Amino acid sequence: MYDYAFVHLKFTVPAAVLLTAIAYPILNRIHLIQTGFLVVVAFTAALPWDAYLIKHKVWSYPPEAIVGPRLLGIPFEELFFFVIQTYITALVYILFNKPVLHALHLNNQQNPPAWMRVVKVTGQVVLVALSVWGWNAAQVHQETSYLGLILVWACPFLLAIWTLAGRFILSLPWYATVLPMFLPTFYLWAVDEFALHRGTWSIGSGTKLDFCLFGKLDIEEATFFLVTNMLIVGGMAAFDQYLAVIYAFPTLFPKVNRYPTTHMLLQSRLINTSRYDLERIEGLREAVERLRLKSRSFYLANSLFSGRLRIDLILLYSFCRLADDLVDDAKSRREVLSWTAKLNHFLDLHYKDADATEDPKKKAERIDAYIKTAFPPCAYQALHLLPTHILPPKPLYDLIKGFEMDSQFTFHGTSDSTDLQYPIADDKDLENYAIYVAGTVGELCIALIIYHCLPDMSDTQKRELETAACRMGIALQYVNIARDIVVDARIGRVYLPTTWLKKEGLTHKMVLENPEGPEVIERMRRRLLENAFELYGGARPEMQRIPSEARGPMIGAVENYMAIGRVLRERKEGTVFVRMEGRATVPKRRRLSTLLRALYEQ
């Protein structure tokens, strides 16, 4: 009795609920629009086709297996299947595509490799051929009619999607397309086999090939679920392609609202691919790789941001990392000061040498010319793509001041080693340094978040949020210093204040020679961590005021970094993995659980 409703209650609804619970922290309005749009399209496209199948006895349902109500002869349970299948597959697609930065996969739109052209054309030819064969097979009531009806209905839609987004789909990682297609398909095959075995629905004799993939699962039913999931995944990917165009190219879409409009999506579809700035895509690829190699915590958290905010955060990190590397890789203090002077001049060209009458294109060319002459080629993209039109100047200049403080250190074993200087004399110097190198980054991140998510935020709220972000940045830097005492000593740096050392009867030289040694160093490490967690405790509640789209990922990034501090505080064998000869590390499972907890709590 009511077997079809039982199938939903036992299989499809629980799967949808579970996927919703898993995906909930990362779902945003765009995902809901994507999924809702595809549900409407799937329902509308399947309605007349399904009605035709039932009318011509291809599909049938025992009266006792359904509740009763119908639309165009289709049981309500079947109508619900259109919706629930689309929803399930869309959620699986969203989950597997969240780590993917789709903008990186627009690079094959202008000059695709030969293999991609061949695959796309081959796919088009095959889909046309299957459509024609399906049309012929569906004309007569014979064993191939059900398979023909599936193909003549689905293949034209697949052809349209493949023509519009084939190159983009081929550019995506296999796990972002193949798994969302096949995982729901395998699950629904099992559900369908169960229903066919129970007689919940049946395929009319004489309309099928009578070949089963396994058990009672007819090859036609297996084909149906495969091609419909291909349609759903293809539709989601096509949607993501046009979103990626909007987010990736500010020259084509200078201002993107919180959520792109339908008009913008249509524009992105109609824009000629020759206008795509592929140099920007390559620069973004460099930035992502720099992020992946240099910061596991932020790399993980960044994938949870969305849209142009995610891209701008990556570009900001790339600039900060590049500037830091220029300082760290320098061979002398003089070289460090040379780099900081060049970085300051780069900022001057953007912020201080602004001439309202100067043509923006000429200004950009002038800045690019300076970048190419003053910096190595590997630095070009990080500097060129920095979104200075959004970022406030003061935190950027202060960031360079932090590098200037670093320049006062000499490098162990170099010709400068006879003139040791340690700029962090007391608590105030320590705080200033942390503000310069980390508090500024917090302020810059908040500036990007406000610009992209809540540009109408009041000035008072902005200042309060920026202050909290700065304090949180200081806390994270204290954790960083506590973690890297040994690593920093190897390059001749001691960030512990001189006043702390004197109180404990230590000198900088003693720390450099034996950074893992006396217990007093461990006491100072704990003092740094106490200061860090005190600042963290004061700033953490303020982070709840971050706009909802960015709150979870931002808090997740902070919590992942503070987990390092917790590792250092625990120091219990078997509880965590700590390498004091280098850097404390947080196990991957713990990093992931910390991030998920932060997301679910929002």
Swiss-Prot record:
Gene Ontology molecular function, alphabetical: 15-cis-phytoene synthase activity; geranylgeranyl diphosphate synthase activity; intramolecular lyase activity; lycopene beta cyclase activity; squalene synthase [NAD(P)H] activity
Pathway: Carotenoid biosynthesis; beta-carotene biosynthesis; Carotenoid biosynthesis; phytoene biosynthesis; all-trans-phytoene from geranylgeranyl diphosphate: step 1/1
Transmembrane annotation, as ranges: 6-26, 30-50, 76-96, 118-138, 146-166, 168-188, 230-250
Effect of residue 189 to R: In JA26; Abolishes lycopene cyclase activity and accumulates a polar precursor carotenoid of neurosporaxanthin
GO biological process: carotene biosynthetic process; carotenoid biosynthetic process
Domain of life: Eukaryota
Reactions that this protein is recorded to catalyse: all-trans-lycopene = gamma-carotene; gamma-carotene = all-trans-beta-carotene; 2 (2E,6E,10E)-geranylgeranyl diphosphate = 15-cis-phytoene + 2 diphosphate
InterPro entries documented for this protein: Isoprenoid_synthase_dom_sf (IPR008949), Lycopene_cyclase_dom (IPR017825), Squ/phyt_synthse (IPR002060), Squalene/phytoene_synthase_CS (IPR019845), Trans_IPPS_bact-type (IPR044843), Trans_IPPS_HH (IPR033904)
Region of interest (Phytoene synthase), residue spans: 248-602
EC number: 5.5.1.19, 2.5.1.32
Inducers of expression: By blue light.
GO cellular component: membrane
SUPFAM superfamilies per UniProt: Terpenoid synthases
Membrane topology field: Multi-pass membrane protein
Main location: membrane
Keywords associated with the record: Carotenoid biosynthesis, Isomerase, Membrane, Multifunctional enzyme, Transferase, Transmembrane, Transmembrane helix
Subcellular localization(s) per the UniProt record: Membrane
The keyword DNA-binding is annotated on this UniProt entry: no
Annotated stretches, region: Lycopene beta-cyclase: 1-241
NCBIfam families listed in its UniProt record: CarR_dom_SF
Function per UniProt: Bifunctional enzyme that catalyzes the reactions from geranylgeranyl diphosphate to phytoene (phytoene synthase) and from lycopene to beta-carotene via the intermediate gamma-carotene and from 3,4-didehydrolycopene to torulene (lycopene cyclase). Torulene is further processed to the acidic carotenoid neurosporaxanthin. The cyclase preferentially catalyzes single cyclizations at only one end of the substrate to produce monocyclic carotenoids. Neurosporaxanthin is synthesized from geranyl-geranyl pyrophosphate (GGPP) through several enzymatic activities.
Family from the record: In the N-terminal section; belongs to the lycopene beta-cyclase family. In the C-terminal section; belongs to the phytoene/squalene synthase family.
Name of protein: Bifunctional lycopene cyclase/phytoene synthase
